[in-house]
């Protein structure tokens, strides 16, 4: 019943009047009958079972709706046939920290299961992060992505969490009108890639002891500029999300030459060795 409710919510998002920033007024709706909707003989988390109730045609152009529905139908089948089993494996095999190697050396490696790694590849192939940045369907690309995430989330074994943070990081870079550094441009390309071998996830390392609801005002981490253009960070983050990500964003205050730091927090890109090598 939960999946049926999710399916109905997804279809409503695509077929009812959805107001987008570039569409201040909805277009007229057309009535559709259940017989005109796609059907599937295989398990899917997109098409309701046994048959959907009458719904209203989307206000989006038919040229956009048809391929979107086809993709969501196919993805729904993949959720039922593959992703849900992987999600169950992720929940049955939570990550853990391996503190020592076989020789007693301190390593502190984060160990994740193979199903978790496979979720990353699937997310790239399906364009779960990439869709809204490709703009293939204009302002409807966000609605399309949201529908796909709704289908994916309940069966993802919580992999939807790092994907949401990855989307947030990509949006930050996209909002930078210049994408001011080669590193930013490279990172944006990886965050929005559909190729598993080049797709990156991003963490968000922001929360400090004084953070509360005022994350910016409670940030005490200081960033000292280095001669090579990087920053040396000094501070305490008591929560670091998506620790296995390929990159992360963190908040800090940049220290100037006089030892003073800005009141407004600056968003910095913290890179691991993988990014440095690419």
Where are these regions (language model features)?
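Internal maturation/activation junctions in enzymes
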Residues: 179-229
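A short core secondary-structure module
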Residues: 230, 234-277
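Short, well-ordered alpha-helical packing segments
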Residues: 149-153, 166, 170-174, 188-192, ...
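Glycine-rich, histidine-containing beta strand-loop boundary motifs that form or position
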Residues: 90, 101, 110-114, 162-164, ...
């Amino acid at each position: 019943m939960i999946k049926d409710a999710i399916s109905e919510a997804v279809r409503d998002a695509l077929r009812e009047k959805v107001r987008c920033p570039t569409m201040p007024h909805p277009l007229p709706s057309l009535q559709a009958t259940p017989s005109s909707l796609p059907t599937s003989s295989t398990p899917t988390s997109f098409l309701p079972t046994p048959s959907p109730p009458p719904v209203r045609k989307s206000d989006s152009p038919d040229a956009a709706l048809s391929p979107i529905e086809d993709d969501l139908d196919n993805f729904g089948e993949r959720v039922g046939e593959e992703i849900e089993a992987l999600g169950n494996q992720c929940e049955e095999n939570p990550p853990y920290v391996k503190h020592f190697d076989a020789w007693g050396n301190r390593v502190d490696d984060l160990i994740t299961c193979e199903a978790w790694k496979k979720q990353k590849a699937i997310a790239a192939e399906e364009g779960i992060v990439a869709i809204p940045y490709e703009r293939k369907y204009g302002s409807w690309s966000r609605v399309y992505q949201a529908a796909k995430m709704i289908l994916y989330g309940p069966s993802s074994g919580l992999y939807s969490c790092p994907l949401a943070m990855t989307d947030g990081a990509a949006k930050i870079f996209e909002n930078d009108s210049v994408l001011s550094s080669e590193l930013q441009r490279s990172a944006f390309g990886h965050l929005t890639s559909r190729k598993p071998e080049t797709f990156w996830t991003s963490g968000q390392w922001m929360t400090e002891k004084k953070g509360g609801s005022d994350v910016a005002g409670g940030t005490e981490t200081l960033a000292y500029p280095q001669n090579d253009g990087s920053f040396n960070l000094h501070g305490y983050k008591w929560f670091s999300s998506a620790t296995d990500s390929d990159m992360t964003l963190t908040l800090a205050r940049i220290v100037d030459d006089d030892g003073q730091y800005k009141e407004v927090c600056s968003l910095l890109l913290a890179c691991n060795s993988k990014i440095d090598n690419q």
